[in-house]
Amino acid sequence: MDGTDVTMLMREIGVRARAAAAELAFAEPSRKEEALNAAAEAMLARSDEILEANGRDLAFGAEKGLTPAMMDRLKLDAARIDGIVEGLRAVAGQPDPVGQVIAEWDRPSGLHIRRVRTPLGVVGVIYESRPNVTADAGALCLKSGNAVILRGGSESFHSSGAIHAALQDGLRQAGLPVDAIQRVPTRDRAAVAEMLRMVEHIDVIVPRGGKGLVGLVQAEARVPVFAHLEGICHVYADGEADLEKARRVVLNAKTRRTGICGSAECLLIDRAFLAKHGPVLIEDLLKAGVEVRAEGELAQVPGTVPAQPEDFGREFLDMIIAAKVVDGVDEAIAHIRRYGSSHTESILTENDATAERFFRRLDSAILMRNASTQFADGGEFGMGAEIGIATGKMHARGPVGAEQLTSFKYLVTGDGTIRT
């Protein structure tokens, strides 16, 4: 496909998306819910087709030499399809955000003012190897009354296509425009460049992928961007941490799934914790098969690898973690400020004042206490699904669910009221 053809294709998709968005903006909540539940049923009916398409993508990924983490993100199986289906049903059951009254008040002038949620319009989602993003993004945009243009990575091309077909089945059954959820039907990278320039057709771009993709989108987009940067997540074991809680959380935060953005990439151990309990957290990780890149006295633990400066502030997405000793919560905070990506940090402590200091003095999108960073997920937050974890400070932060995909307008009611 040459450049002219890609430009025309994307313009046509944009025009259709804008028309669909105008209709979706006033669609009844029951019709959107019906579409999502029907899409879930279609996903089950098409599961063999989806798995066959995913097999083709996995073969393509292996030929390209994708990393184990990327292959894990790409892979679908019956359990993961069930997870997608449950995600669709969960989003369907969420309260519809469109039209919700955020605030209302009366003015001395006699005016009654309401601030209510409205759709953003058209959302463009650019993502890499995760085919489930097709379903999550499509569902959340539909729930929030937005049309969406999906541009998946070349690795998940066939899987995304099969999932997209199920989403459109749901739209048809509910009598909603199929153009509400469109997929860019080409691997040509020129389509991404076109999306980033489509200010007349797209209201916001959501990039979902690695640092390279997000950086490209931020540098070149003329459309506003919800940035999802790297998940350089930290776990800090305070001197007053409960040992058994700490052992459970650290192991889960690193090893449950290493290829997701909520996986812990750096472990900070307070010197007081080390004095009480020894290097037990490091030993647990080593026994689980994690490569521990350790600094200072932790590098003396048998089986560890000496950390290099570049290991801190790095997203491994693998069975690797950086580790160092810190003197108190303030040193942990300073380290996270320097090396973190404003994604998710967890403190392990039984001291309320220390936890509050950690919460107040860090400004990551998600801060946790005595909980695994792997909970940094829209589904786990009760949103049904997420379109990404926004690490910026404008508009949306943290898991981006249906509510975060809305703006607002003011509805002002008077009674022949005039301004003097």
Curated annotation (Swiss-Prot):
Pfam family, one: Aldedh
Gene3D superfamilies membership: Aldehyde Dehydrogenase, Chain A, domain 1, Aldehyde Dehydrogenase, Chain A, domain 2
InterPro entries, per database record: Ald_DH/histidinol_DH (IPR016161), Ald_DH_C (IPR016163), Ald_DH_N (IPR016162), Aldehyde_DH_dom (IPR015590), G-glutamylP_reductase_CS (IPR020593), Glu-5-SA_DH (IPR012134), GPR_dom (IPR000965)
MF (Gene Ontology): glutamate-5-semialdehyde dehydrogenase activity; NADP binding
Intracellular or extracellular location(s): Cytoplasm
SUPFAM superfamilies given in the database record: ALDH-like
Biological processes annotated in GO: L-proline biosynthetic process
Entry's Gene Ontology cellular component terms: cytoplasm
Broad class of where this protein is predominantly found: cytoplasm
Range of residues in the leader sequence: none
The enzyme's E.C. designation: 1.2.1.41
Keywords: Amino-acid biosynthesis, Cytoplasm, NADP, Oxidoreductase, Proline biosynthesis
Pathway recorded for this protein: Amino-acid biosynthesis; L-proline biosynthesis; L-glutamate 5-semialdehyde from L-glutamate: step 2/2
Catalytic activity: L-glutamate 5-semialdehyde + phosphate + NADP(+) = L-glutamyl 5-phosphate + NADPH + H(+)
Function of the protein: Catalyzes the NADPH-dependent reduction of L-glutamate 5-phosphate into L-glutamate 5-semialdehyde and phosphate. The product spontaneously undergoes cyclization to form 1-pyrroline-5-carboxylate.
PANTHER family associated with the record: DELTA-1-PYRROLINE-5-CARBOXYLATE SYNTHASE (PTHR11063:SF8), GLUTAMATE SEMIALDEHYDE DEHYDROGENASE (PTHR11063)
Family affiliation: Belongs to the gamma-glutamyl phosphate reductase family.
Stated name of the protein: Gamma-glutamyl phosphate reductase
Source organism: Cereibacter sphaeroides (strain ATCC 17023 / DSM 158 / JCM 6121 / CCUG 31486 / LMG 2827 / NBRC 12203 / NCIMB 8253 / ATH 2.4.1.)
Lineage: Bacteria, Pseudomonadati, Pseudomonadota, Alphaproteobacteria, Rhodobacterales
